[in-house]
Amino acid sequence: MSNWLVDKLIPSIMRSEVKKSSVPEGLWHKCPSCDAVLYRPELEKTLDVCPKCNHHMRIGARARLNIFLDVDGREELGVDLEPVDRLKFRDGKKYKDRLTAAQKQTGEKDALISMSGTLLGMPVVASAFEFSFMGGSMGAIVGERFVRAANYALENRCPMICFAASGGARMQEALISLMQMAKTSAVLARLREEGLPFISVLTDPVYGGVSASLAMLGDVIVAEPKALIGFAGPRVIEQTVREKLPEGFQRSEFLLDHGAIDMIIARSELRPRLGNLLAQMMNLPTPRFVAPVIEPIIVPPAPATI
């Protein structure tokens, strides 16, 4: 073996491997919209909104509730509920196995989390869909957790907010999942009868049985920028009508222009704007919002590839 190979090439390869392994996994994230390579700690400060192009990335249900509700006084509702494979459903894989895999991947028992707490000091109850759990699909547990949150609002005379992110009803639960559309719609009718506000916040994406029920039944319907919202997907519609759809079809901006939703609010503005709106709807004093101080972050040079 030559001296050059021993003295130069092998140490160079070893240094390269050490350098690669010293970069923690998940430290960098590529924006799916503009391909900018973003430093994860910086992205957390912007609530997972790309600082380069303002793309609102998908975030988990628990993270969403944590950034929306006040820190103190949160309590999760329906935490004891777990899904059951009553139909012994199987497609390419057993439903029971799909549930186990989704629970392991997300750390959640099902695709909806509900919490009571406060928003700028005002008592509220909030629910959020976990899209990473089987596409945020709505089954019996999702429906029951939503109903328990609504019942909490009824018992405590407080408003309810839901952050929807779902592909629709859960196929593996068949009619049981479709029944949740009626079940959730019925409890929202009770909220309306009692004069308690329900605000629906549509995030990317909202489709199927969720968009056809609870997601579009808000007293005020809000969406994040550029969220995909519809019943069937745009490709399915194009194949059905055999026509090219308008640019931006099913994006939140398109729906706002056509009167299907009430407003679009950036993620960073949801707390103050919804807090102010709910205070007006509940005839309460305007809450005081203090924007968090964002400490500057020193961003190291981005890697060439991630």
From Swiss-Prot:
Domain of life assignment: Bacteria
EC number: 2.1.3.15
Catalysed reaction, written as an equation: N(6)-carboxybiotinyl-L-lysyl-[protein] + acetyl-CoA = N(6)-biotinyl-L-lysyl-[protein] + malonyl-CoA
Subcellular location: Cytoplasm
Gene expressing this chain: accD
Associated pathway: Lipid metabolism; malonyl-CoA biosynthesis; malonyl-CoA from acetyl-CoA: step 1/1
Keywords of the record: ATP-binding, Cytoplasm, Fatty acid biosynthesis, Fatty acid metabolism, Lipid biosynthesis, Lipid metabolism, Metal-binding, Nucleotide-binding, Transferase, Zinc, Zinc-finger
Subunit structure: Acetyl-CoA carboxylase is a heterohexamer composed of biotin carboxyl carrier protein (AccB), biotin carboxylase (AccC) and two subunits each of ACCase subunit alpha (AccA) and ACCase subunit beta (AccD).
GO BP terms: fatty acid biosynthetic process; malonyl-CoA biosynthetic process
Taxonomic placement: Bacteria, Pseudomonadati, Pseudomonadota, Gammaproteobacteria, Pseudomonadales
Name of the protein in question: Acetyl-coenzyme A carboxylase carboxyl transferase subunit beta
Record text on cofactor binding: Binds 1 zinc ion per subunit.
GO MF term list: acetyl-CoA carboxylase activity; ATP binding; carboxyl- or carbamoyltransferase activity; zinc ion binding
